[in-house]
Amino acid sequence: MKVNVDMNSGFCFGVQFAIDRVEDEMKASGPLYSLGDIVHNAVEVERLEKLGLKTITIEEFKTLKNTRVFIRAHGEPPSTYKLALENNIELIDATCPVVMKLQQRIKEFYDRGYQVLIYGREGHPEVIGLCGQCNNEAIVLKHADLSDRGETEKIDFSRKTVLFSQTTKDTTGFYELKANLENVFREHHAAQNFDSAATESIVPDFQAKDTICRQVSNRDQKLAAFSKENECVIFVAGRKSSNGKVLFEVCKDANSNTHFIENQSELERAWFLRPDDSLVESVGVCGATSTPMWVMQQVAEHIRATFAAERFVQS
C-alpha cells in the first residue's frame, strides 16, 4: 500500500506568516497572548502553547492592560484596536493581507451607503472582523439557495447592495448565491414597477464581489485530482476550520472513500480495506489551509507503520 502526501496542501501564506511571526515574537520577548486560536487546528495550537502562547477570549482581552497581544490572520473589528489603545495594549498584528484588503473594501462600500451582504458563517472570527467594518450592520448569508427566511427577511431589496464573501468560502456556493440574489432583486423590481417605461435608474444597484482567497479556490481542482488518483483519501483538518469543511467536500465529491480526521488517533482500519478484505493500493493524505504539513506527514507515517505493514495484511 502506497501512502502519498499532497504537497499542495498545508498552510496558506496568511496562516504561515502568522505562525512564523508569533514564533519569532516569542523567541525574542517570551510568552505572548493570542486573541482567539491562532489557527483552527487543535494540534498546532497545542504545539504553540507549549512554546509560550496563551490563547484568550475577547472577554479576557477586555480585562488586560499594559501587555502584548497577538492578532491572528482572521483579523479583528475596529473595536478591538480601540480597546487596545485605551488599555495600553501593544498589538502584534498578523491579519492576512487578503482579509485586510477585504475589510477596507467593505468599509468603503458601507460609507457610500451600500447595504452589505456577506457570504459566510455567522460568528466566524473573520466574519466578526468584517462585520465590524460596517458597524455590525452587514447581513451574513450562509445558505446559497436562500432557503433560510431568517437570513433573507433582513435584506432590503430596494436598497443598493453589495455582496462579498468570507475569504475561505467555496466559489460554487458564492456564484449560486449571486445568481439567486440577482433573480430576487430583479423580481422585486418588476413587482414594484409596472410601468414598462420605467427608467433603468430605478433598478436597485446590486453588485457581487468575489473575495474568496485564490489560494483557497485554486486548491479545489488540485485536491479533486489528487483524490481521484488515490483509492482512499485521509483529509486532515481542525473541526473548527471553515476551509477544512469546504475542501473536505471537494475531496469527498471526487472520491467517496474520503475520511475526515483531526489527528492520527482517529484513523480506522476498515478505511484501508476493500470489500474482499485486501488492502487498498494507495492512500492520499491531504488537508486544509490551516493544517500544518508536519501533521499530515505524521499521519502518513502512522498509516505506513500501522496499516501498511505486512503484519496488518496477515492479521
Curated annotation (Swiss-Prot):
UniProt similarity note: Belongs to the IspH family.
Annotated protein name in UniProt: 4-hydroxy-3-methylbut-2-enyl diphosphate reductase
Cofactor(s) needed by this chain: [4Fe-4S] cluster
Pfam families: LYTB
GO BP, one annotated term: terpenoid biosynthetic process
Pathway(s) it belongs to: Isoprenoid biosynthesis; dimethylallyl diphosphate biosynthesis; dimethylallyl diphosphate from (2E)-4-hydroxy-3-methylbutenyl diphosphate: step 1/1; Isoprenoid biosynthesis; isopentenyl diphosphate biosynthesis via DXP pathway; isopentenyl diphosphate from 1-deoxy-D-xylulose 5-phosphate: step 6/6
InterPro entries: LytB/IspH
Enzyme class: oxidoreductase
Catalytic activity: isopentenyl diphosphate + 2 oxidized [2Fe-2S]-[ferredoxin] + H2O = (2E)-4-hydroxy-3-methylbut-2-enyl diphosphate + 2 reduced [2Fe-2S]-[ferredoxin] + 2 H(+); dimethylallyl diphosphate + 2 oxidized [2Fe-2S]-[ferredoxin] + H2O = (2E)-4-hydroxy-3-methylbut-2-enyl diphosphate + 2 reduced [2Fe-2S]-[ferredoxin] + 2 H(+)
UniProt-annotated binding residues for [4Fe-4S] cluster: C12, C96, C213
Organism: Chloroherpeton thalassium (strain ATCC 35110 / GB-78)
Residues given in the record as dimethylallyl diphosphate binding sites: H40, H74, H124, S241, S242, N243, S290
EC number assigned by the record: 1.17.7.4
